[in-house]
């Protein structure tokens, strides 16, 4: 792993932007994208930049099950608001959380990933070590699948909803095996609440109990962390 330590999340977004810019300039055409609060400053930099993604494909990690793309809490809505409405991509893909045929939805997304090998995969890090919505216990060779969210993940996401009862309890997520197929993985984690997961991811045992620990086995991983997230290294 290439570990980049920064003072704060703003500096982290600047370093992540440089990696996106360099990767695009070198001819990359497929970018795996993430949601949540961590990548928002990065997306703002991409929107304000002269970078041209009009020939690039974006493939998102996950989506809540049961939310339509028009729901303000959906990741379709999030990506439109923060990136896709402002920066043109050739094509964009996000898992279909409304497809009643779950097998079809997961199989379709696996085909999309197979047909568009990811050059750079952006990741955040959950407090319990999840990547995407791959919760502890997820098989390292997993493909796109339906996830029962843990209570800690539900609690962490509750701040985005008016009432905790409105927080979805399931999601459709790219699998860990799919994430690991990317040529380059870029993970960002900021804040003291991520320190335990960061330490276990980087120096702990490789175990499905801590999904992000599998990144130790990938040949090209960049981790951007601030001082608070690095406190327990």
Curated annotation (Swiss-Prot):
Q: Where are the transmembrane segments?
A: none
Family of the protein in this entry? Belongs to the glucosamine/galactosamine-6-phosphate isomerase family. NagB subfamily.
What's the encoding gene here?
nagB
Q: Which UniProt keywords apply?
A: Carbohydrate metabolism, Hydrolase
Q: In which pathway does it act?
A: Amino-sugar metabolism; N-acetylneuraminate degradation; D-fructose 6-phosphate from N-acetylneuraminate: step 5/5
Function in brief: Catalyzes the reversible isomerization-deamination of glucosamine 6-phosphate (GlcN6P) to form fructose 6-phosphate (Fru6P) and ammonium ion.
Which Gene Ontology cellular-component terms appear in the entry? cytoplasm
The active site is formed by 62 (proton acceptor), 128 (for ring-opening step), 130 (proton acceptor), 135 (for ring-opening step)
Q: Which domain of life is it from?
A: Bacteria
Under which name does UniProt file this protein? Answer: Glucosamine-6-phosphate deaminase
Q: Which GO terms describe its biological process?
A: carbohydrate metabolic process; glucosamine catabolic process; N-acetylglucosamine catabolic process; N-acetylneuraminate catabolic process
Q: Which reaction does it catalyse?
A: alpha-D-glucosamine 6-phosphate + H2O = beta-D-fructose 6-phosphate + NH4(+)
Q: GO terms for molecular function, please?
A: glucosamine-6-phosphate deaminase activity; identical protein binding
- Under Enzyme Commission nomenclature, its number is 3.5.99.6
Q: Which Pfam families match?
A: Glucosamine_iso
Which residues, if any, are the signal sequence?
Answer: none
In terms of InterPro entries, this protein maps to: Glc/Gal-6P_isomerase (IPR006148), Glucosamine6P_isomerase (IPR004547), Glucosamine6P_isomerase_CS (IPR018321), NagB/RpiA_transferase-like (IPR037171)
């Amino acid at each position: 792993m290439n570990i980049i330590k920064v003072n704060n999340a703003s500096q982290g977004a600047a370093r992540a932007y440089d990696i996106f810019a360099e990767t695009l300039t070198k001819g990359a055409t497929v970018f795996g994208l993430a949601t949540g609060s961590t990548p928002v400053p990065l997306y703002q930099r991409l929107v304000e930049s002269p970078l041209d993604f009009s020939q690039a494909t974006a493939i998102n990690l996950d989506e809540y099950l049961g939310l339509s793309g028009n729901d303000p809490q959906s990741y379709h809505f999030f990506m439109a608001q923060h990136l896709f409405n402002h920066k043109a991509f050739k094509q964009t893909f996000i898992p279909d959380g409304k497809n009643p045929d779950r097998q079809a939805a997961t199989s379709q997304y696996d085909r999309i990933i197979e047909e568009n090998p990811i050059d750079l995969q952006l990741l955040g890090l959950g407090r319990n070590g999840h990547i995407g919505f791959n919760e502890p216990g997820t098989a390292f060779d997993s493909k796109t699948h339906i996830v029962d969210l843990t209570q800690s993940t539900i609690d962490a996401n509750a701040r985005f909803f008016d009432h905790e009862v409105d927080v979805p309890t399931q999601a459709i997520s790219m699998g860990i095996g799919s994430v690991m197929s990317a040529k380059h993985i870029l993970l960002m984690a900021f804040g003291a609440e991520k320190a335990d997961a960061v330490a276990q991811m980087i120096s702990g045992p490789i175990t499905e109990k801590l999904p992000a620990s599998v990144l130790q086995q990938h040949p090209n991983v960049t981790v951007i962390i601030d001082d608070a997230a690095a406190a327990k290294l």
